[in-house]
Design a protein with these regions (language model features):
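Short beta-strand/loop segments at the ligand-binding rim of alpha/beta enzyme cores
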Residues: 44-51, 97-102, 221-231, 273-289, ...
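Active-site-adjacent beta->alpha loops and helix N-cap segments on the catalytic face
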Residues: 31, 80-89, 149-154, 199-219, ...
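Glycine-rich phosphate-binding active-site loops on the catalytic face of alpha/beta enzymes
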Residues: 68-83, 250-262, 303-321, 351-385
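Bateman/CBS regulatory modules and CBS-like beta-alpha motifs in cytosolic regions of diverse proteins
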Residues: 31-45, 52-54, 83-123, 128-130, ...
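Short hydrophobic beta-strand motif reused across regulatory alpha/beta modules
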Residues: 136-142, 201-205
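Catalytic beta/alpha-barrel core
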Residues: 75-78, 104, 125-127, 147, ...
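Catalytic cores of alpha/beta
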Residues: 61-64, 240-248, 289-307, 347, ...
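Alpha/beta catalytic cores of nucleotide-metabolism and tRNA/nucleoside-modifying enzymes
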Residues: 1-25, 105-106, 171, 231, ...
């Protein structure tokens, strides 16, 4: 390769629409391939997909849905520290082998307070404990079935709960199989675990067994809880935020900036990695688009490198700042540092179709991060809007004016674009736009099509694993005529396929 420092025109930048993959001889069956991939040095996903840390893409509901499908969600940081940590706890509590620190309620709380607590944590009932954490009962929606709602403000939990003497309980050390047998034999949905003194130490629910069977590929930690990541910055309260997220049980922290090679971002990564209290948390750094940028993150100690400067559909960095690298080339350049170091690479942004996932992997990625492809899902936090009788969901870049503006609250995305010191909203220089994407329904259906497309890629390449995709894949560059030929052409499309939308062309 020519020295791009001496010859500014030596390097050609290619993106997904500039290349196709060559078909290979194959005996691979699409339904039998293994799509598992390394997210970080220590975390392996069953599918190589992450949902982006954007305020119209990933909050707790999306993170739960992504983990159940075998990927992982990265919670955005345009939230207060308390809100972001609370969302981490929501994900970790949503499913587990045993809830070791269950949410509880006191006997003198009102039913109205119980309802608010259950709604916040998305649970159907709570154990009732006294001031000494002694289990004195349990209250679920069964107990409230015939209680008029107009009495909820005055009725106490003790008036409606199932008392301790009527409960089925388990002892500390009860195995999963024993718990399942107790639940089935007694036809109950919740099994409180108590110690010798009658204190509540955990809670096992029948829903966790059902969810395990329903989502066999779910991404879980060693305690059977769904895994979740969260974004942090490098400025202001970042250290306090990182500590709060660690204490809430986060599995992955993403030091997320528009230029991962910035000194302040690298310094924050080194600070987190040097603290032994973060040994159980994997650290991802980004974003970069060059070999040097990736190497700087690796030298700082990251467990994965995130690649992408300006490829997103809502990003304007490349035209506002004139900086960026087309994504396929960016992935390749970063992989020149990541591969020898054994550090996984995440391709972030620019994907329009399922076929782009395979292209990213052949270029050097291990996993891909998705924004616009997931923003239209039911589980995304974006607002639903109607335009000309069709449903859409709002989608915006974290560098958009709306995401960066304070509007009466503190904005946490300004520092991602190194504008944390901007004194007022009218001085912000946006690097993104606000828009909308078609409503696409449940995440599970969208992921099925995306992963199904990857299965087909692996079939065509004769690759039964993600590593084999990297080994077998070969690119061919195409012209604008070749791109036109690749899409449906010379016909009026009457019915859109679930995995192809003409609006993305």
């Amino acid at each position: 390769m020519a020295d791009i420092h001496n010859d500014p025109f030596a390097l050609t930048g290619l993106t997904y629409d500039d290349v196709l993959l060559l078909p290979e001889l194959t005996d691979v069956v699409p339904s039998e391939v293994d799509t598992s991939a390394q997210l970080t040095k220590k975390i392996r996903l069953r599918i190589p997909l992450l949902s982006a840390a954007m305020d119209t893409v990933t909050e707790a509901r999306m993170a739960i849905a992504m983990a159940r499908q075998g990927g992982i969600g990265i919670l955005h940081r345009n939230l207060s520290i308390e809100e972001q940590a609370s969302q981490v706890r929501q994900v970790k509590r949503s499913e587990s082998g045993m809830v070791e620190d269950p949410v509880t309620i006191g006997p003198d709380a009102t039913i109205e307070e119980l309802d608010q607590l259950c709604g916040h944590y998305r649970v159907s009932g709570l154990p009732v404990v006294d001031d000494d954490q002694q289990l004195i009962g349990i209250i679920t929606n069964r107990d409230l079935r015939f209680v008029p709602t107009d009495q909820w403000a005055s009725l106490k939990v003790r008036d409606c709960m199932t008392p301790r003497e009527r409960l089925v309980t388990g002892k500390v050390g009860t195995s999963r199989e024993e718990a399942k047998a107790l639940l089935a034999t007694n036809r109950v949905e919740k099994l409180p675990i108590i110690d010798e003194d009658g204190r509540l130490t955990g809670l096992i629910t029948v829903k966790d067994f059902v969810k395990t069977e329903q989502y066999p590929n779910a991404t879980k930690d060693e305690r059977g809880r769904l895994m979740v990541g969260a974004a942090v910055g490098y400025w202001g309260d970042t250290w306090e935020r990182a500590c709060a997220l660690r204490d809430a049980g986060v599995d992955v922290l993403v030091v997320d900036t528009a230029n991962g090679g910035a000194a302040l971002a690298l310094e924050m990564i080194r600070k987190i990695k040097a603290d032994p209290t973060f040994d159980g948390v994997q650290i991802i750094g980004g974003n970069v688009a060059t070999t040097e940028g990736a190497q700087a993150l690796i030298d700082a100690g990251v467990d994965a490198v995130k690649v992408g400067v300006g490829p997103g559909s809502i990003c304007t960095t490349r035209v506002v700042a004139g900086v960026g690298v087309p994504q396929v080339t960016a992935i390749h350049l970063a992989s020149l540092a990541c591969k020898p170091a054994g550090v996984p690479l995440i391709a972030d942004g620019g994907l329009q179709y399922s076929g782009d996932i395979g292209k990213a992997i052949v270029a050097g990625a291990d996993t891909v991060m998705l924004g616009s492809l997931l923003a239209g899902c039911e589980e995304s936090p974006g607002e639903v809007v109607f335009t000309n009788g069709k449903q859409y969901k709002r989608y915006r870049g974290m560098g958009s004016l709306g995401a960066m503006s304070s509007r009466g609250r503190k904005s946490y995305s300004k520092d991602r674009y190194f504008q944390a010191d901007v004194s007022s909203d009218d001085k912000i220089v946006p690097e993104g736009i606000e828009g909308q994407v078609p409503y696409t329904g449940a995440l599970a259906a969208v992921v099925y099509q995306l992963v199904g497309g990857l299965h087909q890629t692996m079939f065509y390449l004769g690759a039964s694993t993600i590593d084999a995709v990297k080994r077998n894949g070969r690119f061919v560059r195409i012209t604008s005529a070749g791109l036109r030929e690749s899409h449906p052409h010379d016909v009026q499309m009457t019915t859109e396929a679930p995995n192809y939308h003409s609006s993305a062309k």
